[in-house]
């Protein structure tokens, strides 16, 4: 490993110790490299504003940073183990190409605020993707709720048959859930949308840095004012981002559980397209719902990432090297979470209900609640009506149909009044 920015003259670096210190940083930093380059350009502009760089030096730095970004995208430049991290790689490239101008780029800046600003920009993009995907999932669910509003579906509590429900109700539930997930992700974008660049190692510097310029140039909504809080916010903002992602993957886990049950031979309510299943290496008859099972498992990765960062934050104020480990947590958590969410809209759009199986699973006892409520409307105290309906549950369905039960369910949000217009308005507000 070469290009250690902090190495002092005459001090040897032990290779094993340095390997331990670096960990897998340089691999993880590939996620943040382009954001670090963008922040370096903004920082260079700010240095020119206060006379540290000349216009000519700024022009050379901007050009070389653009070339480095292009080389990274094309694969001509590889961020590998010869560098300690993405920050040293950028400075080494600029120094190699520009000499003293490259050596000036780090004036007024620490790797502490350098990684803060890069991860902050990265988190904004990832959260915006969570919001977009959640809105797409909600859109599919709303469309199917409208189209299948009257399709009878058994309603379950405790995984036991309970009441007559509808596909419309099932879809509307997921629509509202993912609308909330989109809102939460958007709210979290606003939380993390603050610029830490210029706080240096956590105590500011003796330079009049143009932090207002870098805030505007990088598209941040506001300045993160306190250098102390800049360091305190590391991990805290990552936690908030993972919690927003976790809200979506938690619902993903539950919808995947529903589909795992509904596609089983014991239920057989839903048919998945073949591309969402795999086979067995020994049992020729099998079609395994591996996609939804791995979707179901995704939340564990997100929750683990959140727990890892939360445990890292048992620290006093100021920067501590422990926080390096937060990068792996967010990269792995968002990597797994977003990969699963990306597949969900198309899966939901293409799953097929089996109406005959759904209807066959609706038994007489599932009308007992209707019988009890109807008796209460007629003046029988509900608890007495409940007891009578319980005793006669085996005959509660006589003369009744699933469609009739659904048509009578007029409470707001229930089968006869799904209030999809209200949900549609909330969904439209996401686009505003």
Curated annotation (Swiss-Prot):
One of its GO terms (molecular function) is argininosuccinate lyase activity. It comes from the Bacteria. It catalyses: 2-(N(omega)-L-arginino)succinate = fumarate + L-arginine. Coiled coil: none annotated. InterPro entries: Argininosuccinate_lyase (IPR009049), Fumarase/histidase_N (IPR024083), Fumarate_lyase_CS (IPR020557), Fumarate_lyase_fam (IPR000362), Fumarate_lyase_N (IPR022761), L-Aspartase-like (IPR008948). It holds the Pfam family Lyase_1. It is found in: Cytoplasm. Keywords: Amino-acid biosynthesis, Arginine biosynthesis, Cytoplasm, Lyase. Its EC number is 4.3.2.1. Belongs to the lyase 1 family. Argininosuccinate lyase subfamily. This is Argininosuccinate lyase. The gene is argH.
